[in-house]
Design a protein with these regions (language model features):
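Secondary-structure boundary elements
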Residues: 153-160
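Catalytic cores of alpha/beta
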Residues: 169-175
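Amphipathic, alpha-helical segments enriched in basic
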Residues: 1, 17, 24, 109, ...
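Core AdoMet radical
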Residues: 9, 30-40, 55-73, 85-107, ...
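Canonical Radical SAM [4Fe-4S] cluster-binding loop centered on the CxxxCxxC motif
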Residues: 1-44
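Generic structural signal for well-ordered alpha-helices
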Residues: 46-50, 78-82, 108-113, 148-152, ...
């Protein structure tokens, strides 16, 4: 006798913003490849499923969205991710710093200001140790200093700063 299958969760994922490095602890493999699907089409698809969920009165259905693997979005993508988060009843206000390409000076200040104007109120950094230890785990020299400099600049602008520090015994060989 056939059984009815009722889905409870839909997850949509788009590799839109390539990662500038590959962390040794990351679960997303080969994250430098970018999907050929434009973000605007991805957003339309997800909105159609939200509309379907509403029309079918499927309050029991959870729709999850991930656009990554880094949050190095252009402003239009950032606004689109915010629209998708609003459909879930949330706000997209904190930007994760992992995997961003390195910017400096006026370019970094302008990048930060563009995000502040677009509604980002703070930044989050996941740090795998201090200084060179973090850099080794993340596969990019200077990454620890880069992420902490963005947090400092954000704090100077009155923005929220969030840090997560991973504590573990270092098992990486010295290079």
């Amino acid at each position: 006798m056939p059984r009815e299958i009722v889905g409870k969760v839909l997850r949509f994922s788009l590799r839109h913003a390539p990662c500038a490095h590959i962390c040794r602890y990351c679960l997303i493999s080969e994250s430098r490849k970018r999907s050929p699907l434009p973000f605007s089409r991805f957003e339309q698809l997800v909105h159609r499923f939200y509309d379907w969920k509403q029309s079918q009165q499927r309050d029991d259905l959870e729709i999850g969205v991930f656009v990554g693997p880094s949050f190095d979005y252009d402003i239009e993508t950032l606004k689109g991710v915010a629209r998708l988060r609003e459909r879930r009843g949330g706000k997209f206000q904190i930007l994760n710093l992992g995997g961003l390409r390195i910017r400096s000076g006026d370019e970094l200040a302008a990048w930060l200001e563009e995000r502040r104007v677009a509604g980002i109120v703070g930044f989050h950094a996941s740090l795998a140790g201090y200084g060179e230890i973090h850099d080794r785990w993340n596969g990019r020299a200077g990454d620890f200093d880069y992420q902490t400099s963005i947090l400092r600049l954000a704090g100077e602008r009155g923005m929220i700063r969030q840090e997560k520090l991973f504590l573990a015994q270092n098992t990486l060989r010295k290079h």
